[in-house]
Amino acid sequence: MRRPAAVPLLLLLCFGSQRAKAATACGRPRMLNRMVGGQDTQEGEWPWQVSIQRNGSHFCGGSLIAEQWVLTAAHCFRNTSETSLYQVLLGARQLVQPGPHAMYARVRQVESNPLYQGTASSADVALVELEAPVPFTNYILPVCLPDPSVIFETGMNCWVTGWGSPSEEDLLPEPRILQKLAVPIIDTPKCNLLYSKDTEFGYQPKTIKNDMLCAGFEEGKKDACKGDSGGPLVCLVGQSWLQAGVISWGEGCARQNRPGVYIRVTAHHNWIHRIIPKLQFQPARLGGQK
């Protein structure tokens, strides 16, 4: 007599488990499905975007990739041991008076990729471990990291976000609202060609390394800038946002023939996996492109 009653209970438990899993799915904002030339974002539009702060001041962006981990750029940290100086702001749309949906988290440790050797170097990635797991909300959610099988095709439109300067000369005006900018992926041979141009104007040729990715416009005018470093370049693949790159470097901001250069996340899959073994990566079969 009691046995049939166990079936609905089992179904209920399975359903509850699926709901809990769906509630923490990466790369899916719940609210919605200032860069150079950028535009204001909406509340909860990019719930993985974080502000990394030193002594209370924003200096780099980053992305929440797990409840206790943030992905950013290695060049953001000159001294990875002074963790007491750093804090991470999550769930914020603006830096001045972030609002009720935002929270601050302390930093436990910073792991910079040991292969990073300085400005415009390969391996410009770092992982920031927070002191405690953060609760996922409508405004705080992780972005998906792509499996190495995922290829972000040339011309694909992706988005870069951050609180950086709107130009080389100006600061983002208060209340410093998070900016977003759509940028197309540029293939590496073309990007190398662009970075070899204009040497008569004093530019030094730069080489786009194997773990780098270019995105932006040949004519310039729109780009990430100072203060955006470490932030995410994300692409909508299927129904999920995958982080293709980490904002790394460029020649000035939004200059002609000088698109933004990002560190390719898939190139550092093994390093990230070593530090966060339980982190799951989104494979190409779930919507990626080959």
Curated annotation (Swiss-Prot):
Disulfide bonds join C60-C76, C158-C235, C191-C214, C225-C253. Its EC number is 3.4.21.-. Coiled coil: none annotated. GO terms for biological process: proteolysis. The active site is at H75 (charge relay system), D124 (charge relay system), S229 (charge relay system). The keyword Secreted applies. It comes from the Eukaryota. It is found in: Secreted. Residues 1-22 form the signal peptide. Residues 23-34 form a propeptide. One of its GO terms (molecular function) is serine-type endopeptidase activity. InterPro entries: Peptidase_S1_PA, Peptidase_S1_PA_chymotrypsin, Peptidase_S1A, Trypsin_dom, TRYPSIN_HIS, TRYPSIN_SER. Glycans are attached at N55, N79. One of its GO terms (cellular component) is extracellular region. Keywords: Disulfide bond, Glycoprotein, Hydrolase, Protease, Secreted, Serine protease, Signal, Zymogen. Residues 35-277 form the Peptidase S1 domain. Expressed predominantly in the pancreas. N-glycosylated. SUPFAM superfamilies: Trypsin-like serine proteases. Belongs to the peptidase S1 family. This is Serine protease 27. The lineage of its organism: Eukaryota, Metazoa, Chordata, Craniata, Vertebrata.
